C-alpha cells in the first residue's frame, strides 16, 4: 500500500512538473515571438513598403540608429561580409512580457539586390565562420532568398551581426547585370510597442481612455493595475487595464484628461533603417583597368629614360 502511494505521488509530481515546464515554455516563446521578424514574415509579403519604409517600424515605434558595412565592390560568385551594427547601452534593461526587467534582444532584416543570397556553408571561410558564431539566418520567404532576417538574439553578444553573402554571376543569371545596386537594412533592439493586430504590448505608455477622477486603483495579483475613472458629467465610469511592466503615474483622487498618460513609457529600445550601395564588378573591366594602369606606368618610365638619354646627348654636345 505504501509503495502504491509513493507511485501515485511520483506520478502526480511528474505531471505537475511537465505542466509547469509547458506553461513556462509557452510564456517564453510568446515573449520572444511577439517582438521580432516572425511577425513581419507572417503579416507582410515584403518587409519594405513602397514608400521605402521597413515594416518593422510599425511595431517598434521609437527611432534608433543602425549601421551597415559592405565592400564598395565585389566580384561575381564571391563571398563577402555584410556587417550590421545595432548600437545601444548594454547596461540598460527592458520590460519583459511578464513585467520583469531583463536584457535587450536584437533583430535585423537585410534586403539585398535580386540574385544576392546567403552564402552556403561550404563557401564560407573559417575566418567568417568564427565571426558568425552560432547565428542562424533565415530567408524572409522561400521565394525571397535575397531577403534575410535574424532575431531575436542576445544583444549583449551580437550588437554586430555578420551576414555571409554570395554575389551572383551574370554568366549564369541573365537577370543580373554588372552595375551599382542598393542594399536596405533595418535593425531593432528591444521589444515592440504594438502588435500587428493593433493591440499594445506592455512595453509602451498607457493613456486614460476618458476624462474624469481616478476613483479606484486595483493592483492585480499577477501584476498590473485596474484604474477606474469616473466621469461625473456623463454619469459613467471606465476601467483602464494596465499590464505588468509600466509604472503608474497617477493616484486615487487625481483628475485626468482623455489620452493623458497613466503610466511612464518603459521602452528603452527602438528601430532604425539605413541604405548602402554595392557594385557588382566585371572582372574583365578590372583586368582592362590594370592593363591601362600598367601602360601608363610604362609610358612614364620610358619618358624618364628618354629624358635622361636626351640630357646625356646634350651634355656630350656641350663637352665637344
From Swiss-Prot:
Q: What is the role of the protein in this entry?
A: Component of the cytochrome b6-f complex, which mediates electron transfer between photosystem II (PSII) and photosystem I (PSI), cyclic electron flow around PSI, and state transitions.
Q: Tell me which family the UniProt entry assigns to this protein.
A: Belongs to the cytochrome f family.
Kindly name one Pfam family recorded for this protein. Apocytochr_F_C
Protein name (database record): Cytochrome f
Q: Where are the transmembrane segments?
A: 286-306
Which domain of life does the protein's organism represent? Answer: Eukaryota
- Keyword field: Chloroplast, Electron transport, Heme, Iron, Membrane, Metal-binding, Photosynthesis, Plastid, Signal, Thylakoid, Transmembrane, Transmembrane helix, Transport
Mode of membrane association? Single-pass membrane protein
- The protein's predominant localisation is plastid
Annotated signal peptide: 1-35
Q: Name one GO molecular function term.
A: electron transfer activity
GO cellular component annotations of the record: chloroplast thylakoid membrane
What is the annotated localization of this protein? Plastid, Chloroplast thylakoid membrane
Give binding positions for heme: 36, 56, 59-60
**Cofactor(s) annotated in UniProt:** heme
Please give the subunit comment from the record: The 4 large subunits of the cytochrome b6-f complex are cytochrome b6, subunit IV (17 kDa polypeptide, petD), cytochrome f and the Rieske protein, while the 4 small subunits are PetG, PetL, PetM and PetN. The complex functions as a dimer.
The cofactor note from the UniProt entry for this protein is: Binds 1 heme group covalently.
Q: Which Gene3D superfamilies match?
A: 2.40.50.100, Cytochrome f large domain, Single helix bin
Record keyword Heme present: yes
Amino acid at each position: 500500500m505504501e509503495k502504491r502511494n509513493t507511485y501515485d505521488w511520483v506520478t502526480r509530481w511528474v505531471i505537475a512538473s511537465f505542466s509547469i515546464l509547458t506553461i513556462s515554455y509557452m510564456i517564453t516563446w510568446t515573449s520572444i515571438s511577439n517582438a521580432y521578424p516572425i511577425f513581419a514574415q507572417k503579416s507582410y509579403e515584403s518587409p519594405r513598403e513602397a514608400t521605402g519604409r521597413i515594416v518593422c517600424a510599425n511595431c517598434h515605434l521609437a527611432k534608433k540608429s543602425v549601421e551597415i558595412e559592405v565592400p564598395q565592390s565585389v566580384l561575381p560568385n564571391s563571398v563577402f561580409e555584410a556587417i550590421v551594427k545595432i548600437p545601444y547601452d548594454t547596461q540598460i534593461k527592458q520590460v519583459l512580457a511578464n513585467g520583469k526587467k531583463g536584457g535587450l534582444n536584437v533583430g535585423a532584416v537585410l534586403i539585398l539586390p535580386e540574385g544576392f543570397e546567403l552564402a552556403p556553408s561550404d563557401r564560407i571561410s573559417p575566418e567568417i565562420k568564427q565571426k558568425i558564431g552560432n547565428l542562424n539566418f533565415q530567408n524572409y520567404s522561400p521565394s525571397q532568398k535575397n531577403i534575410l532576417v535574424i532575431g531575436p538574439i542576445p544583444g549583449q553578444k551580437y550588437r554586430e551581426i555578420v551576414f555571409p553573402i554570395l554575389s551572383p554571376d551574370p554568366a549564369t543569371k541573365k537577370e543580373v547585370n554588372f552595375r551599382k545596386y542598393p542594399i536596405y537594412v533595418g535593425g531593432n533592439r528591444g521589444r515592440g510597442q504594438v502588435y500587428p493586430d493593433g493591440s499594445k504590448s506592455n512595453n509602451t505608455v498607457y493613456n486614460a481612455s476618458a476624462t474624469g477622477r481616478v476613483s479606484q486603483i486595483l493592483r492585480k495579483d499577477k501584476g498590473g493595475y485596474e484604474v477606474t475613472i469616473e466621469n461625473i458629467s456623463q454619469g459613467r465610469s471606465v476601467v483602464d487595464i494596465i499590464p505588468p511592466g509600466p509604472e503608474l503615474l497617477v493616484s486615487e483622487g487625481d483628475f485626468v484628461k482623455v489620452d493623458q498618460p497613466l503610466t511612464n513609457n518603459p521602452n528603452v529600445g527602438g528601430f532604425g533603417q539605413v541604405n548602402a550601395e554595392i557594385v557588382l564588378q566585371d572582372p574583365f573591366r578590372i583586368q582592362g583597368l590594370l592593363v591601362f594602369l600598367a601602360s601608363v606606368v610604362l609610358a612614364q618610365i620610358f619618358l624618364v629614360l628618354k629624358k635622361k638619354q636626351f640630357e646625356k646627348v646634350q651634355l656630350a654636345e656641350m663637352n665637344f
